[in-house]
């Protein structure tokens, strides 16, 4: 879906709309640790999370860990993966390292990072549409392929919840998802289109 409707009353540059279109379709591609079918299933779970009875009840609780139950899932993804998706989409401010480590123990560190990054990328694009009163995009078609499950070199324990690149010249926000570079690229593209514009971030005057 190209952002044609808001362009009639709000000036949106081509880099922004083109980035949304490109990134959205690539979310449906086979990832490093999840297949295209699994990634699109995860995207369906992101939207389902907002009408999930368990998520709604947890949001009203003093602590989400006080509420037990099953998510209203719409996929056959692993239970822990669904929990990651729903909680990250609806209540990210109350996630804990202890909880994250349990999920990682179940699905693996790299799959955790890829899935979390996918949720964040989709959340930005969906929220952008909601803020402009636009219908949400149709989920992309799952693309074929098999995950290569290759862990990149140069990553390790830097004191975060997950392994990251040990290159200290990068800001934490720039290396948060570096354990899965291909999916991290999608996040970087969104950040640059919406906010930093890459090298232009250092310029004191932005011509937007």
Feature map (PLM): residue ranges:
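Hydrophobic alpha-helical segments
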Residues: 1-208
């Amino acid at each position: 879906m190209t952002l044609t409707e808001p362009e009639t009353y709000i000036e949106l540059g081509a880099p922004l709309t083109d980035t949304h279109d490109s990134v959205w379709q690539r979310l449906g591609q086979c990832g490093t640790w999840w297949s295209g079918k699994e990634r699109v299933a995860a995207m369906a779970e992101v939207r389902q999370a907002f009408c999930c009875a368990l998520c709604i009840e947890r949001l009203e609780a003093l602590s989400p860990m006080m509420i037990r139950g099953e998510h209203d899932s719409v996929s056959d993804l692993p239970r822990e993966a669904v929990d990651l998706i729903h909680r990250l989409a609806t209540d990210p401010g109350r996630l804990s390292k202890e909880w994250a480590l349990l999920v990682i123990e179940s699905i693996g560190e790299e799959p955790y990072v890829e899935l979390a990054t996918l949720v964040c990328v989709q959340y930005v694009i969906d929220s952008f549409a909601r803020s402009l009163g636009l219908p949400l995009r149709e989920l992309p078609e799952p693309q074929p392929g098999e995950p290569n499950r290759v862990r990149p070199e140069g990553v390790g324990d830097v004191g975060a919840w997950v392994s990251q690149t040990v290159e200290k010249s990068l800001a934490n926000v720039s290396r948060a998802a570096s354990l899965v570079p291909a999916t991290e690229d999608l996040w970087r593209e969104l950040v640059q289109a919406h906010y930093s514009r890459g090298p232009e971030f250092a310029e004191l005057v932005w011509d937007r």
